[in-house]
């Protein structure tokens, strides 16, 4: 069975989507992209707490850029989960549009 992201919060899923989209996904860059998407400020602590959880749960890998900055990359588990979620949403959207 492939990995899923169904137990993640919407905010955590959004973080995964942002990480997949950024050329160099680092904490404040992720925060900035989320703020652009939401159209409002996002609490820095909330971002880093959720990044840490996603690393601990095996959805992200963390590596150091320098002494103060970490970058994040999707794991295979995250990529499979995003793909699974995409197919799930697509099927429901197709049905909703057809109705």
Enumerate the predicted regions with their spans.
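Basic, amphipathic "hinge/linker" alpha-helix immediately C-terminal to the N-terminal HTH DNA-binding motif
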Residues: 67-86
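Short alpha-helical segments that sit at the start of domains
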Residues: 1-24
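A short, conserved structural fragment
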Residues: 55-64
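Short, positively charged loop/turn segments that connect secondary-structure elements
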Residues: 35-46
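Short acidic, hydrophobic short linear motifs in intrinsically disordered regions
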Residues: 25-34
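Amphipathic alpha-helical dimerization/coiled-coil segments
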Residues: 83-99
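A cross-family signal for key residues in well-ordered alpha-helices
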Residues: 17, 32, 83
């Amino acid at each position: 069975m492939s990995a899923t992201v169904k137990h993640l919060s919407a905010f955590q899923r959004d973080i995964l989507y942002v990480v997949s989209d950024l050329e160099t996904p680092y904490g404040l860059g992720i925060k900035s992209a989320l703020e652009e998407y939401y159209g409002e400020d996002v609490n820095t602590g909330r971002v880093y707490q959720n990044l840490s959880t996603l690393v601990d749960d095996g959805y992200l890998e963390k590596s150091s850029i320098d002494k103060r900055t970490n970058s994040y990359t999707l794991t295979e588990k995250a990529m499979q989960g995003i793909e699974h979620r995409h197919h799930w949403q697509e099927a429901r959207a197709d049905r909703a549009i057809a109705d």
